[in-house]
Amino acid sequence: MQNPANLEVWRRSMDLAVELHRVARGIPGRSAPGLSAQLRRAVASIPANIAEGVGQPSPGLVAKHLAIAIASNFEVETHLLLAVRLCPSLGTCDEALDELRQLRRMLYALRTHYQRQSLSERTP
């Protein structure tokens, strides 16, 4: 079990969560009811699932939680793209979208590492 704060992907996803919470405050409720809350919940789920994963006792379970973090990453991207379309005052959010994509690549790589580790534990 490792400390998630030692992982760059966790630290960067925490930073992104803080940034997107600020962005979410700029989404007017009348333009997109519930979208702000959905965005906040989904972005918080990324570092939460990374942390939950690294706390698991087996590489296979770590990989499972990283897969959930990847799915949350896609969800955040979708909510953010929708918010940009519905609320032009938010701007393009290009930096946040780029960071989401970079984090996703990091998560895929980390998940692959744990999947391989899980397979090697099962192979006699």
Over which residues does each language-model region extend?
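Short, C-terminally biased terminal segments at protein or domain edges
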Residues: 1-124
